[in-house]
């Protein structure tokens, strides 16, 4: 899901792309092979640091969007035939990825407000030899909930207890409407058990297809997997993002984007209330793109 493309700073990004195209050298392609452009990885690491999360640029692998980050993360910690837990309902792309990699999906009940049922999750962990969980902890697609900090702490502790890797799909974390950006579950990861995946696609520029994974001890393996599949992420797009982020316009753009999305989401909710039958229940939340109807 993407918002109105007019909400993105496409003119500024095109200027950055034109600028780097003039100055790119033959070495640019080599310098941007996995794990990706070092300046871009440093910029992403600084974004983590703003939330008090220490991530080394060496732990970050730049990918062709978040979906590649998620797929590579799955490949790094599973083998065909392994069990992977997903939410019910979950992002359809997760199920497609599991099928393609010949992994078994194990769905766990998920509440519209509270998120994944941790008791049901523990029962699943006790009954099945689960290798990984693919979960969205912030602005979940499609329900829209964000897990509380307390629940994220419990989630990370539970998965660590059973030695199960959390693949955290966090592509909507910048699209919060409150005062503070919600922390990812990665913030409470003390045992290198969370692979945190995100991208610029949902909040800045869908067409560039630039994502990443904070991969920790799995970074080298993910680099090798990427070299064997897509080889690398687009060098011009990486360089253009580095140029744009250096202008310090990103946070101003995010503030405008969040304000406009909140207004549009409110208008959509009001229109649905007005035109749909009374028996239709519309769940509204304070982040992301999604409204859930029952």
Label each residue range with its predicted role.
Residues 2-7, 111-112, 140-142, 172-175, ...:
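Short histidine/acidic/glycine/proline-rich micro-motifs that form metal-
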Residues 17-162, 167, 173-192, 261:
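Conserved core of the PLP fold type I
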Residues 13, 190-259:
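Conserved core segment of the aminotransferase class I/II
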Residues 86, 134-137, 167-170, 198, ...:
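Short beta-strand segments
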Residues 1-24:
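Conserved N-terminal helix/loop that builds the PLP phosphate-binding region
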Residues 22-27, 246-251, 272-281:
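Inter-domain helical "communication" segments and dimerization helices
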Residues 9, 20, 36, 40, ...:
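Hydrophobic/aromatic residues within well-ordered alpha-helical segments
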Residues 259-269, 279-294:
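Conserved glycine-rich beta-strand-loop-beta hairpin in the small C-terminal domain of fold type I
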């Amino acid at each position: 899901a993407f918002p109105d493309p007019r909400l993105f700073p496409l003119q500024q990004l095109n200027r950055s792309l034109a600028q780097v195209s003039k100055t790119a050298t033959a070495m640019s392609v080599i310098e941007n092979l996995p794990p990706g452009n070092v300046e871009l990885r440093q910029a992403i690491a600084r974004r983590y640091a703003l939330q008090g999360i220490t991530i080394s640029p060496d732990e970050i692998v730049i990918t062709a969007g978040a979906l590649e980050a998620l797929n590579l993360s799955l490949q790094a910690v599973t083998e065909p035939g392994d069990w992977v837990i997903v939410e019910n309902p979950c992002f359809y792309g997760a199920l497609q990825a599991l099928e393609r990699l010949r992994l078994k999906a194990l769905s766990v009940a998920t509440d519209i407000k509270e998120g994944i049922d941790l008791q049901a999750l523990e029962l699943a962990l006790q009954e099945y030899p689960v290798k990984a969980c693919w979960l969205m902890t912030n602005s979940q697609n499609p329900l829209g909930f964000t897990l509380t900090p307390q629940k994220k702490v419990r989630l990370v502790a539970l998965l660590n207890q059973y030695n199960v890797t959390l693949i955290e799909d966090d592509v909507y974390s910048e699209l919060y409407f409150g005062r503070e950006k919600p922390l990812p579950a990665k913030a409470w990861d003390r045992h290198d058990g969370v692979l945190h995946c995100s991208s610029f696609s949902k909040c800045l520029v869908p067409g560039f297809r630039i994502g990443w994974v904070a991969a920790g001890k799995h970074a080298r393996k993910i680099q090798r997997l990427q070299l064997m599949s897509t080889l690398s992420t687009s060098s011009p797009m990486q360089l253009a993002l580095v140029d744009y982020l250096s202008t310090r316009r990103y946070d101003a753009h995010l503030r405008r984007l969040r304000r406009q999305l909140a207004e549009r989401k409110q208008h959509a909710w009001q229109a649905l209330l007005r035109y749909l039958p009374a028996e239709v229940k519309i769940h509204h939340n304070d982040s992301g793109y999604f409204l859930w109807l029952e």
